[in-house]
Each structure stands twice: as C-alpha cells, then as structure tokens.
Amino acid sequence: MNCIEITSLEDQGLEVYGTLTEAQLRNKLEPEKGIFIAESPKVIHVALNAGYEPLALLCERKHIKGDAASLIERCGDIPIYTGERELLTSLTGYTLTRGVLCAMRRPMPKPVEEVCRNAHRIAVIDGVVD
C-alpha cells in the first residue's frame, strides 16, 4: 500500500483533486492524458468493473481500513493520499462522499463509425458536458 500522508495542500500530486478545472482534467489537446474524478466507493467500484484505470486515491484516514479497504486492494500500487476530513475538505472544497475520491484515466473518445455501427437509433445532444 502506497499511503502518502498529506501535510500541506501544496503537496505534489494533489492538484487533480483541488486546483485543476474540469477543462484541464479533460485535456482536449492531449486526450490520452485526460482524467476524471470518481466520487464514493460505489462509483469507483463501478468504474473499475468497467475497466477504467485508477491513477490515485484520496481517502480520509479513517476509511483506509473501512469503506476504502476493498478499493485499495483492487487498485494495486497507486498513490493513496490521506489525511483528516478537515484537510481534505479544504483541498476539494466539499466533504468527500463516503470519504473517498479516485482520479481515473478518461477513455479515448470512440470514432463515430464505431458508436453507430450496430445502432438502431442515435440521439444527438448538443451542449451537454459530462
């Protein structure tokens, strides 16, 4: 387990949880570097089951052996940033849902031809983000 105790909001690796905007996380210029944040153990498990790659976890210390234990086991040797609830709330700007967030690699967009290949109906929705 690669636990990293957060001592400062300036610690390297934390920017994905607090200072980067959605546009920066999405990384339109280099989509292979795109990241999204999964919130709560349930959502993170669903993303892992769907094959998404975890990059780092942000977890309240008390959840490492609790709600996050099975996630930590599934995620392998990724950084697990941990600290007290108040510090993590200061970092993210809100109280973590069930005490866990996971930075995950955003999938590359599929070509239109692949998406439409076996479709019977296609809905085109403009202006929707995430």
Residue ranges and their predicted role:
Residues I4, K42, N49, I80, ...:
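RNA substrate-binding interface of SAM-dependent RNA methyltransferases
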Residues I35, L55-L57, P79-Y81, G99-C102, ...:
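Structural motif
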Residues I72-G93:
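A glycine-rich helix N-cap at a beta->alpha junction
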